């Protein structure tokens, strides 16, 4: 039967619960166990799909099309399996389902309450996500003490009682602030955080204590005494040089052993040689490259979390230190392209809305005209098509209908609207073959033989994840191709453009999908590996 590890956080947010949970998941997986992971978010939004990246960070897309919290990305990068929409849910989804049940009369006229109706729905969803796993790690978003988290904490308390101590553990992540003036670590915030947790009926079995410096044994004893946690279960999580050191750090303090002993699981010792290889490659590069990421959310780099990690993975695969320069595309509009002129490669990521778009187009034009390696993703591909149409294909008014609904040259348009070769608007409703207005999740793409993309992937048909409403307009493809833009990949039905490249450019590649969502530190991703290699080659030939 599935065992449960409930992961909570205290003192402050952004301590790294997701990394800690994912690291423990990877340790248990390395012991031969089947692991499932679940993130429960206490916000009332149904999902993060409509939330500003500057508030929430990245929206991670699963293969089955769920728009989820960025922690799902950590889970997939650390645990070698794809998760689904069952592995992430929010307060909004729970309330939506309970209210829908009430409207149908499922509660037989009873008063609908947080307990038991909301908590029962939460427990039901936890069990669905855990189905078939040996161990399920369940992360509660937010911080203990937040009013929004209370229904989730009550639900995991109940579930812990229902399955019993032999099948449930509680792991609490806290901060131990170091006061430089006093020269000591303060344990009081952790004591109060655990006290808050115990007041609602949850006694932590494991404490993960984040700190800047190693804990003394006396400090561990003090924490154990005041929190009623075994001393051996007080785990010190230091600031790591790379997040991929964390599994080894936690393993050396016996975290996975605590779990297997508690659950009476007879499992082999974890082999972490693959993690050691990753860390060794990342911390001991043989060369370096400078890559400009030109976007509109650069004030919060969490908005590009998977993309940043994918570039790091490309560096790991090629023994290259990837130095990412975050360039605000609006600054390029105001100040010119001076900040990207000495870069070894340029990347324009996905995004929505017109703000900063002309800066992205300027960066793309610079990359194209100066033979700088370029990778465009989602909006980065659409703007590459717009730039090429304007400056090469003789279509100076080219634009996307997302950004200029009245454009006379819509080289990029909503999936449900197309301009044919005669300039006539073709409209399809959401029930037509092209689907709805948002294309989400894994889709197959057929690559053209002899193209750079085909060479990079080494496969005729690939599967990548999408999140977009707009596509390259088929009505302009003949003119774009005649000017030198190569359509190197299409959806398997041939209707939608998936990848483009410029044949007479050393390395100019763009894709409609998001390859960063399938990159992992141990296996990397062929597109990011090739991009980093191209940046390194450009550096060698120009500097």
From Swiss-Prot:
GO terms for biological process: 'de novo' CTP biosynthetic process; pyrimidine nucleobase biosynthetic process. Keywords: ATP-binding, Glutamine amidotransferase, Ligase, Magnesium, Metal-binding, Nucleotide-binding, Pyrimidine biosynthesis. ATP binds at residues 14-19, 71. Residues 290-541 form the Glutamine amidotransferase type-1 domain. It is an enzyme of class 6 (ligase). Mg(2+) binds at residues 71, 139. Its EC number is 6.3.4.2. CTP binds at residues 13, 146-148, 186-191, 222. Pathway: Pyrimidine metabolism; CTP biosynthesis via de novo pathway; CTP from UDP: step 2/2. UTP binds at residues 13, 186-191, 222. GO terms for cellular component: cytosol. The active site is at residues 378, 514, 516. Gene3D superfamilies: 3.40.50.880, P-loop containing nucleotide triphosphate hydrolases. It comes from the Bacteria. PROSITE patterns: GATASE_TYPE_1 (PS51273). It catalyses: UTP + L-glutamine + ATP + H2O = CTP + L-glutamate + ADP + phosphate + 2 H(+); L-glutamine + H2O = L-glutamate + NH4(+); UTP + NH4(+) + ATP = CTP + ADP + phosphate + 2 H(+). Allosterically activated by GTP, when glutamine is the substrate; GTP has no effect on the reaction when ammonia is the substrate. The allosteric effector GTP functions by stabilizing the protein conformation that binds the tetrahedral intermediate(s) formed during glutamine hydrolysis. Inhibited by the product CTP, via allosteric rather than competitive inhibition. GO terms for molecular function: ATP binding; CTP synthase activity; glutaminase activity; identical protein binding; metal ion binding. L-glutamine binds at residues 351, 379-382, 402, 469. Homotetramer. Belongs to the CTP synthase family. Catalyzes the ATP-dependent amination of UTP to CTP with either L-glutamine or ammonia as the source of nitrogen. Regulates intracellular CTP levels through interactions with the four ribonucleotide triphosphates. CTPSs have evolved a hybrid strategy for distinguishing between UTP and CTP. The overlapping regions of the product feedback inhibitory and substrate sites recognize a common feature in both compounds, the triphosphate moiety. To differentiate isosteric substrate and product pyrimidine rings, an additional pocket far from the expected kinase/ligase catalytic site, specifically recognizes the cytosine and ribose portions of the product inhibitor. PANTHER family: CTP SYNTHASE, CTP SYNTHASE-RELATED. This is CTP synthase. It comes from Hydrogenovibrio crunogenus (strain DSM 25203 / XCL-2) (Thiomicrospira crunogena). The gene is pyrG.
């Amino acid at each position: 039967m599935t065992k449960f590890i409930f992961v909570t956080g205290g003192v402050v947010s952004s301590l790294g619960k997701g990394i800690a949970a994912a690291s423990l998941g990877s340790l248990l997986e390395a012991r031969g166990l089947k692991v499932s992971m679940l993130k429960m978010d206490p916000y009332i939004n149904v999902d993060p799909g409509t939330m500003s990246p500057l508030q929430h960070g990245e929206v991670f897309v699963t293969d089955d099309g769920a728009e989820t919290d960025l922690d799902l990305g950590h889970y997939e990068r650390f645990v070698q399996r794809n998760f689904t929409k069952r592995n992430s849910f929010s307060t909004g989804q729970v309330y939506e389902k309970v209210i829908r049940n009430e409207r149908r009369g499922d509660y037989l006229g009873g008063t609908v309450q947080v307990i038991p109706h909301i908590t029962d729905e939460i427990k039901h969803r936890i069990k669905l996500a855990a189905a078939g796993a040996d161990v399920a790690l369940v992360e509660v978003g937010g911080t203990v003490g937040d009013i929004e988290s209370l229904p989730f904490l009550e639900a995991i308390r109940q579930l812990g009682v229902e399955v019993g101590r032999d099948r449930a553990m509680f792991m609490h992540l806290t901060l131990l602030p170091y006061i430089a003036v006093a020269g000591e670590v303060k344990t009081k915030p952790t004591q109060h955080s655990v006290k808050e947790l115990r007041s609602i009926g949850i006694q932590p079995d494991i404490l993960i204590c984040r700190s800047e410096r190693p804990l003394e044994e006396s400090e561990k004893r003090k924490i154990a005494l005041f929190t009623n946690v075994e001393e051996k279960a007080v785990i010190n999580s230091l600031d790591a040089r790379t997040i991929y050191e964390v599994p080894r750090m936690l393993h050396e303090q016996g975290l996975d052993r605590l779990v297997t002993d508690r659950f009476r699981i007879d499992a082999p010792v974890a082999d972490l040689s693959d993690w050691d290889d990753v860390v060794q490659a990342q911390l001991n590069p043989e060369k370096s490259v400078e890559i400009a990421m030109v976007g509109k959310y650069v004030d919060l780099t969490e908005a590009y979390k998977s993309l940043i990690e994918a570039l790091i993975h490309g560096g790991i695969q090629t023994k290259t230190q990837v130095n990412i320069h975050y360039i605000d595309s609006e600054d390029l509009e105001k100040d010119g392209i001076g900040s990207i002129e000495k870069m070894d490669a340029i990347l324009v990521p996905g995004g929505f809305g017109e703000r900063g778009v002309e800066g992205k187009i300027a960066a793309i034009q610079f990359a194209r005209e100066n033979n700088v390696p370029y990778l465009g993703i989602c909006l980065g591909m659409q703007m590459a098509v717009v730039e090429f149409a304007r400056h090469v294909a003789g279509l100076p008014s080219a634009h996307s209908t997302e950004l200029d609904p009245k454009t006379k040259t819509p080289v990029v348009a909503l999936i449900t609207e197309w301009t044919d070769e005669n300039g006539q608007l073709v409209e399809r409703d959401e029930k037509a073959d092209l689907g709805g207005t948002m294309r989400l999740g894994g889709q197959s793409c057929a690559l053209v033989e002899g193209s750079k993309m085909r060479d990079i992937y080494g496969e005729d048909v690939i599967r990548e994840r999408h999140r977009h409403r707009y596509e390259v307009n088929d009505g302009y493809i003949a003119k774009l191709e005649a000017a030198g833009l190569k359509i190197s990949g299409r959806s398997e039905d041939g209707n939608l453009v998936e990848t483009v490249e410029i044949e007479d450019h050393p390395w100019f590649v763009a894709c409609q999908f998001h390859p960063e969502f399938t990159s992992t530190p141990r296996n990397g991703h062929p597109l990011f590996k090739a991009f980093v290699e191209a940046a390194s080659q450009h550096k060698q030939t120009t500097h």
